[in-house]
Amino acid sequence: MNFEYSEEQNLFSDSLRKLLENKNANADRRKVLEQEDGFHSEALWQNFADFGLLGIPFDEKFGGFGGSAIDVMIAEIEFGKHLSMEPYLASVILGGAAVRLAGSEDQKQALIAPMIAGELKLACAFGEPQSRHDFFDVETRAKKSGDSYKITGAKAVVIGGDCADNLIVSARTSGATANKDGLSLFIVDASAKSVSKRAYRLTDGRGAAEVWLDNVSVSAEHLLGEEGNAWPVIDHVTDLGTAALCAEAVGAMQIVNETTLEYLRTREQFGRPIGKFQVLQHRMVDMMIEKEQSESLALLASMDADKTDTAVRHRAVSAAKVEVCNAARFISEAGIQMHGGIGVTEEYVLGQFVKRLNVVQATFGDVDHHLQRFGALTAAA
């Protein structure tokens, strides 16, 4: 099989790299991290829209690019290499996928088109304080009241919730708390009076929010998909997000490797570069191998993440997440060890990549969660 990018994909990757190098340099990221009025650059977000990045996974009739899963992976790898702070995962990958998979034609037109234009941001409010990685564990309730629903509950660690215009909220319309049946999705105006939130930065500097809904009134027109049957959509959206995170981690790991290799070539001890010591050469090779293995499984996850066969999708995504988490931990620790104290300073770029890789490992299921899911699928096969 040929895994090389096409000419168009190489051009896309090069163009995106140049955009991020010009608009998202380390000094620019530092300014974003220090600013108090928002956790990302609105100017760069509009650059993404002008570039066509926000429309990659969407149909051309909505103004999208009609791109493939590999096109999304290429973009995510570049985001990982440049530590992009923008809510691409939250709005395009997660929110956009929920609308694409469950929305009516009117809902798609109303939400996807302005999102592609950079005029609207989405965020998925699936997690709750007690749910951890099990997004079917939902206590938030939606009660039917005439032609509308009243939603009450709390949502935790809503990625991109700090800047979202609309929230896609999971709520239980029937069934017990941890039941996969009886879940529904609703499009909720994030600025509604009965919606309150506390925005904050994750440890890598990206924005998230805790969200509380107090008897929020939502019309039936804002029900996304079929009432009581939202779990397959939530599960699929989460797999797409996990695959995207795996690709982003590959890009981040590549920069950690390159930064460490350059340091080994320039840092001198005992009269010669420390990269001349064989034990460090072997460790560097191990880091490169881990990154390559992660990239291979991330590619498989990207290709299978949009499949309707749940078992195939779960197996590919979980395998990738396990390998990426293990590789990210090994590469982060080895990179810091070979750098010494400078590797954990706030000003040096390596530490910023390590923080991002730590957040990736904890998002949408850690190693134990995905090992358990992969093991159950293997046993059932």
Task: Give a label for each model feature.
Residues 1-83, 102-105, 114, 118-119, ...:
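Alpha-helical interface subdomain recognition
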Residues 134-152:
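Cytochrome P450 C-terminal beta-domain/meander region
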Residues 101-103, 143, 169-172, 187-189, ...:
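Short beta-strand-to-turn element immediately C-terminal to the catalytic PLP-Schiff-base lysine
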